[in-house]
């Protein structure tokens, strides 16, 4: 049987008080519905039906390049009505997994468990026991077998006392699901077509109904307002922080890290507070990440150190290399083994070779710098003429004095020395000393201008 996933994402989310469709609000820098789509792929979906309604243009602008079947729900008439819109894309022999675009923390392992407990032609529903089930549909059992689901507004006093609730997530056989959806009625307190009514239909038809539960109730929580969205964000971050610690990272405070992507860590990694990690980040063994650092799509090798308040984006930091504090590695920057940049040094599309250093207050762009090079404070590679960018090449063991400008394209030969305050516009040969400063003048008897009275 093919696994056909239906994701319900048509709601406006009025309580969000936003023009953005509810499912596009982010958790960890990724829309809620994208989390669900990614999880659907993780469980091996053969097809994904995205049922949409409000904010169609924004949804398609955000998700349009993905392999999705777009199914319009023109009127929001309930969950059963929403799933029914996808009937034309469901084959009789499909296993249909129904998910929700505003329930972003559902785990692939939980869905795999749900699919595993389902009989070949049976119905499997994901339930959870809550100490306070207020507002949720209750699972009705007879002799411990599920016979139906009753919504909060339609429940009697006995049913309201039930703590096992419906999460809405279920797996059903395609042929029977389409038949059940065709029998739904809106004769209820909400005047909607409840997907939950198919459970009673399945029981009546003698179809086996099985249940599974998530490892944690937070997996099945949705976000209807920004308070709930923030609560899900915290839950996501707590889970991500726990994963890092289990992989070998020491987090100075697990509640003060922001993980917005996929991060892998080696052993004995130390991460201080208020670090932000985005995209795909790989951190080696014995790495130290200082407070307030931002890591985006980067690789940090063994024994490296990113000091406080530094930014590393689309860059590489080599073994025993260090950056910061307050350093910035922009896209294409690379620190080789044991290289170092200090405070207020910025690099872009540049390589700083093994053992080389730029201690402070420098800009290095479109440059290749060899081994053992010293870049003095205030040094700038002048790589842009207003129209095009040019390369600076600095060979091994060069000493660049403070406040030096290197006007590209230019090559500085091995072992050369550039005097402080120089503006270098021509290539420098190996082992040369170059100084371009204006000759110092001494003017005796100089008097400063007197300020005019106001």
Curated annotation (Swiss-Prot):
UniProt binding sites for Mg(2+): 102, 224
Gene Ontology BP annotations: cell morphogenesis; cell wall organization; lipid A biosynthetic process; peptidoglycan biosynthetic process; regulation of cell shape; UDP-N-acetylglucosamine biosynthetic process
Localization terms from the record: Cytoplasm
Residues annotated as catalytic: 360
Residue positions binding UDP-N-acetyl-alpha-D-glucosamine: 8-11, 22, 73, 78-79, 100-102, 137, 151, 166, 224, 330, 348, 363, 374
EC id: 2.7.7.23, 2.3.1.157
One MF annotation (Gene Ontology) recorded for this entry: UDP-N-acetylglucosamine diphosphorylase activity
Binding annotation for acetyl-CoA: 377, 383-384, 402, 420, 437
Domain of life: Bacteria
Pfam families noted in UniProt: Hexapep, NTP_transf_3
UniProt pathway annotation: Nucleotide-sugar biosynthesis; UDP-N-acetyl-alpha-D-glucosamine biosynthesis; N-acetyl-alpha-D-glucosamine 1-phosphate from alpha-D-glucosamine 6-phosphate (route II): step 2/2; Nucleotide-sugar biosynthesis; UDP-N-acetyl-alpha-D-glucosamine biosynthesis; UDP-N-acetyl-alpha-D-glucosamine from N-acetyl-alpha-D-glucosamine 1-phosphate: step 1/1; Bacterial outer membrane biogenesis; LPS lipid A biosynthesis
Keyword tags: Acyltransferase, Cell shape, Cell wall biogenesis/degradation, Cytoplasm, Magnesium, Metal-binding, Multifunctional enzyme, Nucleotidyltransferase, Peptidoglycan synthesis, Repeat, Transferase
Subunit: Homotrimer.
PANTHER family reported in the protein's UniProt record: BIFUNCTIONAL PROTEIN GLMU, NUCLEOTIDYL TRANSFERASE
Function statement: Catalyzes the last two sequential reactions in the de novo biosynthetic pathway for UDP-N-acetylglucosamine (UDP-GlcNAc). The C-terminal domain catalyzes the transfer of acetyl group from acetyl coenzyme A to glucosamine-1-phosphate (GlcN-1-P) to produce N-acetylglucosamine-1-phosphate (GlcNAc-1-P), which is converted into UDP-GlcNAc by the transfer of uridine 5-monophosphate (from uridine 5-triphosphate), a reaction catalyzed by the N-terminal domain.
NCBIfam families linked to this entry: glmU (TIGR01173), PRK09451.1 (NF006986)
Stated name of the protein: Bifunctional protein GlmU
Source organism (scientific name): Shewanella piezotolerans (strain WP3 / JCM 13877)
Organism taxonomic ancestry: Bacteria, Pseudomonadati, Pseudomonadota, Gammaproteobacteria, Alteromonadales
């Amino acid at each position: 049987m093919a696994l056909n996933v239906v994701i319900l994402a048509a709601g406006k989310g009025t309580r969000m008080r936003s023009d953005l469709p509810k499912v596009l609000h982010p958790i960890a820098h990724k829309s809620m519905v994208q989390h669900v789509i990614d999880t659907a792929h993780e469980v091996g979906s053969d097809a994904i039906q995205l049922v949409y309604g409000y904010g169609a243009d924004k949804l398609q602008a955000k998700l349009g390049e993905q392999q999705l079947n777009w199914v319009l729900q023109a009127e929001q008439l309930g969950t059963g009505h929403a799933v029914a819109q996808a009937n034309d894309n469901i084959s009789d022999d499909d296993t249909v997994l129904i998910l929700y675009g505003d329930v972003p923390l559902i785990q692939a392992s939980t869905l795999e468990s749900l699919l595993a407990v389902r009989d070949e032609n049976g119905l499997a529903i994901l339930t959870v026991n809550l100490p306070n089930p207020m507002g949720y549909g209750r699972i009705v059992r007879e002799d411990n077998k599920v016979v139906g689901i009753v919504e909060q507004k339609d429940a009697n006093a006995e049913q309201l006392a039930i703590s096992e609730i419906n999460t809405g997530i279920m797996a059903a056989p395609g042929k029977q699901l389409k038949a059940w959806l065709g029998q739904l009625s809106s004769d209820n307190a909400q005047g909607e077509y409840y997907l939950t009514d198919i459970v009673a239909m399945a029981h009546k038809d003698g179809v086996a109904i099985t249940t599974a539960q998530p490892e944690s109730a937070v997996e099945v929580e949705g976000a209807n307002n920004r308070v709930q969205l923030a609560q899900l964000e915290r839950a996501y971050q707590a889970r991500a922080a726990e994963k890092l610690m289990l992989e070998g990272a020491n987090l100075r405070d697990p509640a003060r890290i922001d993980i917005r992507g996929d991060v892998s860590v080696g052993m004995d990694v130390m991460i201080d507070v208020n670090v932000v990690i985005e995209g795909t980040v790989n951190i080696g063994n014995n790495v130290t990440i200082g407070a307030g650092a931002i890591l985006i799509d980067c690789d940090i090798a063994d024994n490296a150190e990113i000091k406080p308040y530094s930014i590393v984006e689309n860059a590489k930091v080599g073994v025993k290399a260090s950056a910061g504090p307050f350093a910035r590695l922009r896209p294409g920057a690379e620190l080789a083994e044991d290289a170092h940049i200090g405070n207020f040094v910025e690099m872009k599309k540049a390589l700083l070779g093994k053992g080389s250093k730029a201690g402070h207050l420098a800009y290095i762009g479109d440059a290749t710098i060899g081994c053992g090079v010293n870049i003095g404070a205030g040094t700038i590679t002048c790589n842009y003429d207003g129209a095009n960018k040019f390369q600076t090449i600095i060979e091994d063991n060069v000493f660049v004095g403070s406040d030096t400008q290197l006007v590209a394209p230019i090559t500085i030969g091995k072992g050369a020395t550039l005097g402080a305050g120089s503006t270098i516009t021509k290539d420098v040969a190996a082992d040369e000393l170059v100084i371009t400063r204006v000759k110092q003048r001494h003017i005796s008897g100089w008097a400063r201008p007197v300020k005019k009275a106001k």
